[in-house]
Regions:
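Conserved glycine-rich beta-strand-loop-beta hairpin in the small C-terminal domain of fold type I
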Residues: 321, 336-347, 358-375, 411
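Conserved core segment of the aminotransferase class I/II
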Residues: 4-8, 12, 18-24, 257-340, ...
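Helix C-cap/helix->beta junction micro-motif
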Residues: 170, 230-231, 262, 353, ...
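N-terminal small-domain helix-loop-helix segment of the aminotransferase-like
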Residues: 14-134, 141, 311, 323-329, ...
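Generic structural signal for small/hydrophobic residues in well-ordered secondary structure
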Residues: 49, 66, 112, 129, ...
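PLP-dependent enzyme catalytic core of the Aspartate aminotransferase-like
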Residues: 2-4, 10-11, 114, 118, ...
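Conserved core of the PLP fold type I
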Residues: 92-226, 243-258, 265, 424, ...
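Short beta-strand
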Residues: 63-65, 267, 357-363, 405-406
Length: 477
């Protein structure tokens, strides 16, 4: 089977094909004996499902992808001008064309340390920071540095499937703790206490959350830290969506601010917060105030792991100090307004669709989860789960969404909210038509709580202008 490597490629991006029918037992002919490692069978769980959907989109309709976690694909969300100028200047200087320290350029590490130093705590130093090839490598180094024999890590459910892939890659076992949709997708801390054993080396905390769109309150962050301190459990904090929040009453705060003695390995990047995933630069920050990670050799392990890739591009590292110093508040506010407008639009449209609901209003990140009622849809074989829904929506309406099963959230669908309003409206027109065709004839009665939420959001939507891009906001300001 030949599959597309980038389903839903847009704006002139070509899809690359991969042959999945390569023999699994190697090549042994004419004296050759070439065999692949078990890594050939290791991939992001999303790929297993999405690859089956490739080529199934209705060819008579334009493809609308509500699946890609790349905020740049539609072209209406742009990085801050100052960031682009810093990078252009770094390349033009022609003094950053060589290698730098494998853990990162000192100036970049100093800038990251200054940005993430917390008040009333020992200031971070350059030695506490490791520059990485995107946030993915920062996560990989965090996992690998803790990968002792028999180790297990606690992962969120629903959660980003890369965590699971990294555990497999580094020989780490994993257990899933539950997030609670009835309480803003907060962590069920009783679950954490139950799952932690003598081989548990860390817990992954993703805030703001992919795929849930949750932003944890200060109260909940403190409760997480209190629990982890009692359990002597280090935290791997995936904060790549830092500062991407929609509610001023619940702003993003790093968990390291409340961690006490708990060591925190915090990862982030320019990719989502600055809308530059293709620049491939991230960082891993050790908030190790009691030197627990250092004494255990974890810090040394991360330093040695950095020698494998020699770090992200040197010119991008050189631009980091200037990017962090730039005044971009207006740009960030405008970007968040675009995302919030798309989120509100989705909630308003979902309220009109039989069988779909929004259990929890997104508070940040770039995603939302829709809950589907499997009994609301009819099928020939009597089954209608989230995977079936996503496949049929693609084949009939050429709208691509990710089934919640990709994130260990069966019965849900994940949508991105980085889509321009005109394409988002068209996608929802198709989703609504699809659900009408496949719905079981029955009455749907929303709960009073859902009515209040939806009516309130519709009111908000009607009171605000439709915002399609940062440029629209600039014209209005």
């Amino acid at each position: 089977m030949t599959v597309s490597h980038e389903i839903g490629a847009t704006k002139g991006r070509r899809s690359i094909t991969i042959d999945r029918e390569t023999p699994t037992d190697g090549y042994r002919e004419n004296g050759w004996n070439v065999r692949a490692s078990p890594l050939k069978d290791l991939c992001n769980p999303i790929r297993r499902i999405v690859d089956e959907m490739v080529g199934q989109a209705n060819p008579d309709k334009s493809l609308i992808s509500l699946a890609q976690g790349d905020p740049t694909v539609f072209g209406h969300l742009l990085p801050p001008k100052a960031a682009m100028e810093e990078v252009v200047g770094a390349f033009a200087a022609c003094v950053h064309n060589g290698y730098t320290a494998s853990a990162g350029m000192v100036e970049a590490r100093d800038a990251v340390a200054a940005r993430y130093s917390e008040e009333n705590r020992r200031p971070l130093q350059a030695e506490d920071v490791f520059m990485t090839v995107g946030c993915s490598e920062a996560l990989s180094h965090s996992f690998a540095a803790l990968a002792v024999d028999g180790a297990n890590i606690l992962l969120p459910k629903p959660g980003f499937p890369l965590y699971e892939t990294l555990c497999h890659r580094h020989g780490i076992k994993y257990k899933f703790y539950e997030l609670d949709p009835e309480n803003g997708w907060e962590i069920k801390l009783d679950d954490v206490r139950r799952l932690r054993d003598e081989n548990t080396v860390a817990i992954v905390v993703n805030n703001p959350s992919n795929p849930c769109g949750a932003v944890f309150s200060e109260k909940h962050l403190r409760a997480i830290c209190t629990t982890c301190e009692a359990l002597h459990l280090p935290i791997i904090a995936d904060e790549v969506y830092e500062d991407v929040f929609f509610d001023e009453t619940r702003p993003f705060k790093s968990i390291a601010k409340f961690s006490g003695r708990v060591p925190v390995m915090a990862v982030s990047a320019l990719s989502k917060r600055w809308l530059t995933p293709g620049w491939r630069i991230g960082w891993l920050v050790l908030h190790d105030y009691d030197h627990i990670l250092q004494a255990a050799g974890v810090k040394l392990a991360i330093n040695n792991l950095c020698q494998g890739s020699l770090g992200p591009p040197t010119p991008i590292q050189a631009a980091i100090p200037g990017i962090f110093q730039a005044n971009e508040e207006i740009w960030l506010e405008r970007t968040l307004t675009v995302l919030k407008s798309a989120s509100t639009r989705c909630i308003e449209r979902c309220a009109r669709v039989r069988g779909l609901s929004v259990p929890c209003e997104p508070q940040g990140a770039m995603y939302m989860l829709l809950k589907m009622d499997p009994d609301a849809f009819k099928s020939e074989d009597g089954t209608y789960d989230d995977v079936v829904f996503a496949k049929r929506l693609l084949s009939e309406e050429a709208v691509l969404v990710l089934p919640g099963t990709c994130f260990h959230a069966p019965g849900y669908l994940r949508l991105v909210i980085t889509v321009p309003d005109d394409e988002l409206q068209e996608a929802w027109d198709r989703i609504e038509a699809f659900c009408e065709r496949h719905s079981v004839e029955r009455n749907f009665t929303d709960s009073p709580k859902e009515d209040v939420l939806v009516n309130g959001l519709i009111g908000k939507l009607q009171a605000m202008p439709v915002v399609d891009s940062v440029e629209d906001l600039q014209r209005e300001s």
